[in-house]
């Protein structure tokens, strides 16, 4: 993909390549506004703080350590199908980072958590010892398409790393 400048219709200067989000909000958590408005998660929280389905249409605990999610039959905005393999890709990518959540490590999945795509729509996550915050953590695990991971990602061009940049 070639980067192309986005021009101001009034004849102003280019604002940057088309795959760059130019942010003028000085807040250190401005990335929340971007990710929560451009990506989906397995679940969401409604205005009353109650967990609601997102890309996972349902979930259940099989035992105290195993969470099973049934993923929606869905398609990304770029036309790529969403399925259990895409969920696993997102999980694997985030688990590569030491501390993917800038607000705090309490949002990270433990290193011994495993994720298995059982079939096209089923995910099984195993939490050795259990994790009462698992559903909250899923709310913060963004599930972009492969195009995002392959072309854009969360990599900071200054550091060459995605560590803590979402």
Each PLM stretch: what is its role?
Residues 2-63, 70, 92:
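N-terminal lobe/hinge region of extracytoplasmic solute-binding protein
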Residues 3-8, 16-17, 37, 89, ...:
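Extracytoplasmic/secretory soluble proteins
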Residues 44-52, 100-109, 166:
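Short, solvent-exposed secondary-structure boundary motifs
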Residues 58-100, 118, 124, 134-135:
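Aromatic- and charge-enriched surface segment that lines or borders ligand/interaction sites
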Residues 60, 105-166:
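Surface-exposed binding/hinge segments that line
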